[in-house]
Swiss-Prot record:
Residues 167-231 are annotated as: Interaction with host ZC3H7B. Residues 147-203 are annotated as: Dimerization. This is Non-structural protein 3. It comes from Rotavirus A (strain RVA/Human/United States/D/1974/G1P1A[8]). Residues 163-234 form a coiled coil. Residues 205-310 are annotated as: Interaction with host EIF4G1. GO terms for molecular function: RNA binding. GO terms for biological process: regulation of translation.
Length: 310
């Protein structure tokens, strides 16, 4: 009858499935894409290693075998463990803590070999000497009494698997990375300097163009001012000449006064307005001449005279 062993195996398998589900759920919550088969394989490899190296799996199965033997009437294992199985709750809590510690140590890379050696031996330093004394713990003594210690006559020089760091190569790698980063920074800086120089050149060129345009605008403004002054002088001379010519004409005083008022109303400051005023004056003169001609034409008709334009 192996019902307890089967139950323990089922619990271990369920724990593995729970570990896989926890890992995939965590990756999904973090928004990380993953391959389920790869996660399953990695978790299984780590889970099997931790459970086997820590001894948790064998410990649970051993207790299950002891319970099955007791159920089958074989109390040898149960009697052998009665000294420490005094309280089931205390023992269960103690086993739980020990199993946690074993799995934690296994996950940190402290394998079973290292844990057993640390538990079986301790080192005592001798003050003032470079040598030391290796002391066997009670666990080592119990193992010797139980015949769990073997003497290997063949000497095997096994190198301890210790992660060594080649600081020189690490420094060389960091130096290469630093040089590469320095080169990239210099390239970007040089590129930025070239762009800045080009921008400055364009800015100076634009400033020169603006300066030339400003000079041209100033010249044009000066020319316009001169032209405006010449036009103002010309219009003033024109008005004076027309007034003098008007006074020399044999026209009625009211006609002369009317024309002089129109001449004085010409804007001599603004040439555009002056041209408009002169145009208005010319139109009025033509209109007066047209009215005079119509009056003369009507008078000739009343006197039974005919006229002809040659």
């Amino acid at each position: 009858m192996e019902s307890t062993q089967q139950m323990v195996s089922s619990i271990i398998n369920t724990s593995f499935e729970a570990a896989v589900v926890a890992a995939t759920s965590t990756l999904e919550l973090m928004g990380i894409q993953y391959d389920y088969n790869e996660v399953f394989t990695r978790v299984k490899s780590k889970f099997d290693y931790v459970m086997d190296d820590s001894g948790v799996k064998n410990n649970l199965l051993g207790k299950a075998i002891t319970i099955d033997q007791a159920l089958n009437g074989k109390f040898g294992s149960a009697i052998r463990n009665r000294n420490w199985m005094t309280d089931s709750k205390t023992v269960a809590k103690l086993d739980e803590d020990v199993n946690k510690l074993r799995m934690t140590l296994s996950s940190k890379g402290i394998d079973q070999k290292m844990r057993v050696l640390n538990a079986c031996f301790s080192v005592k330093r001798i003050p003032g000497k470079s040598s030391s004394i290796i002391k066997c713990t009670r666990l080592m003594k119990d193992k010797i009494e139980r015949g769990e210690v073997e003497v290997d006559d063949s000497y095997v020089d096994e190198k301890m698997e210790i992660d060594t760091i080649d600081w020189k190569s690490r420094y060389d790698q960091l130096e290469k990375r630093f040089e590469a980063l320095k080169q990239r920074v210099n390239e970007k800086y040089n590129t930025w300097v070239q762009k800045a120089k080009k921008v400055n050149e364009n800015m100076y060129s634009l400033q020169n163009v603006i300066s030339q345009q400003q000079n041209q605008i100033a010249d044009l403004q000066q020319y316009c001012n001169k032209l405006e002054a010449d036009l103002q002088g010309k219009f003033s001379s024109l008005v004076s000449s027309v007034e003098w010519y008007l006074r020399s004409m044999e026209l009625p005083d009211d006609v002369k006064n009317d024309i002089e008022q129109q001449l004085n109303s010409i804007d001599l400051i603004n040439p555009i307005n002056a041209i408009d005023d002169i145009e208005s004056l010319i139109r009025n003169l033509i209109q007066d001449y047209d009215r005079t001609f119509l009056m003369l034409k009507g008078l000739l008709k009343q006197c039974n005279y005919e006229y002809a334009c040659e």
